[in-house]
């Protein structure tokens, strides 16, 4: 079944480029840039990936991102992910990047963007992988910081297909960023947002009504609100679900408890994605395979999930 799932044409719609930083590449970039890591070797770093919640993961994630310094670093990071896309027949990808993670430590916005966009262009021409880039704001930072990032990005507006909202969810509801998303919408940028992962269903309502998102990233806690589920079915607003991430971060205690197939069978437009695959132990095929292994996902369900991902694209092609 793994090989069949791997060959299935897929789109990936919930993927953080910084979350594809594999331990080997992290050490390579650390050596290249003279960055001291707190782990003596790759295996020690792999053992450090034993965290219990979103915040512990984010602490490790931001520490790892410190090795990314130059345009070439961001190119290499993105290119490594695109090679994995080719390996797993991801024909379309719409990755996030978090500019604040880099600009707050002195890396120029233009440096980050240039490396990523060149790799994505090379992915189109050399690998045939289509897609587009999503500019994502860190919700644990103030609204003013997100607005500054948006203003930095607007001169390069054509480099982006949407804006997003990610990072620590609890205590940072979407309504805090309503003005930022209004400004982005005025510039012609559609929106997506992380909601309903650790946060309550109310955050999903806010993302829909206040941020006017076209997709909900995660969204699995929508199942706690029947009226919300009915709205998602009626509007066919997609959920970009990340099964391995959800179990790794204890959104569900085990994969056997995951609700993605229940949502699929009810008519919610759910999709399968890998989120931060270097940290969660698997790329998109591994996520599909986990659903087969633990939930008995059938080939028909896999085809429908893959078709949903193609239908839910924001970028053409």
Swiss-Prot record:
Site features described as Important for catalytic activity, chain residue numbers: 218
GO CC terms: cytosol
One protein family per Pfam: A_deaminase
Family, per entry: Belongs to the metallo-dependent hydrolases superfamily. Adenosine and AMP deaminases family. Adenine deaminase type 2 subfamily.
Positions with a binding annotation for substrate: 276
Keywords: Hydrolase, Metal-binding, Nucleotide metabolism, Zinc
Active site: 197 (proton donor)
EC number: 3.5.4.2
InterPro entries: A_deaminase_dom (IPR001365), ADE (IPR028892), Ado/ade_deaminase (IPR006330), Metal_Hydrolase (IPR032466)
Biological source species: Bordetella parapertussis (strain 12822 / ATCC BAA-587 / NCTC 13253)
Cofactor: how and how many bound: Binds 1 zinc ion per subunit.
PANTHER family for the chain: ADENINE DEAMINASE
Coiled-coil zones: none
Origin: domain of life: Bacteria
This protein's name: Adenine deaminase
SUPFAM superfamilies: Metallo-dependent hydrolases
HAMAP family: Adenine_deaminase (MF_01962)
Lineage: Bacteria, Pseudomonadati, Pseudomonadota, Betaproteobacteria, Burkholderiales
Function: Catalyzes the hydrolytic deamination of adenine to hypoxanthine. Plays an important role in the purine salvage pathway and in nitrogen catabolism.
A GO term for molecular function: adenine deaminase activity
Top-level class of the enzyme under EC nomenclature: hydrolase
Annotated binding of Zn(2+), by residue: 14, 16, 194, 275
